[in-house]
Amino acid sequence: MPKNCKECVRYRLLAISRVVQMPISDSPAQSQRPTLQIDFVSDVACPWCAVGLHALEQAIDRVKDDIRVELHFQPFELNPQMGPLGEDSAEHLKRKYGMGDAQLASARDNLRRRGEEVGFTFGLRSRIWNTFDAHRLIYWAGLKGHQHAMKRALLQAYHSDDRNPGDREVLIDCARQCTLDVAEAAQVIDSGAYSAEVREALAIWQEAGIRSVPSVVINRQHLIQGGQPAQVFEDALRQLALTGS
């Protein structure tokens, strides 16, 4: 069951969004579909965010004939102090979570299995990187209507292809994959554009009580956390659409 997100409804959220399954023109039957707004709060560095997003996408696809979903991507930084050289991922996880070699191997096996279940392939992910510039590019892509595609491209680049999501060339390549103007993408990266907007959004979600990701906030009132199976998301969407919450 979804839980209430502490004070989420009180905070001003970003206006940018990528609307999933929005029809060009609604038939009378389609126009009666209830609409749910989903804010997917996540960090590119978070592997469970890749699992959670793919599971959520499956759930949205299952309910698309009955429920209209507006999907917004919101930023969160797991490692805001991470330097430009990054850190070895195994050393980072052992230090941060107190894992031993056996625990780390088991956790990675579980993650790979869960990824396979939702159609996402995890690669090596040899280092942990700073993701602030990735969040800036996701924000910019949202203004162009490509926020969802950019989020997917960055998750793929890091978690599947072991590329640095804070590297300029990787970011430009992701923009190219999303059919965005690469010259404009480079200008955004080099100028520090949208830093203030991203920092504001980060603060909003921290003040709203978000402390871990992925966090899926539905209608700014109901919170589901973690890389849940698609069925959990589907059940929540159907219940909330039915109750009108």
Question: Where in this protein do the model-derived segments appear?
Answer:
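C-terminal cap of thioredoxin/glutaredoxin-like
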Residues: 5, 16-20, 24-28, 33-65, ...
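Structural alpha/beta surface segment adjacent to cysteine/selenocysteine redox centers
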Residues: 53-161
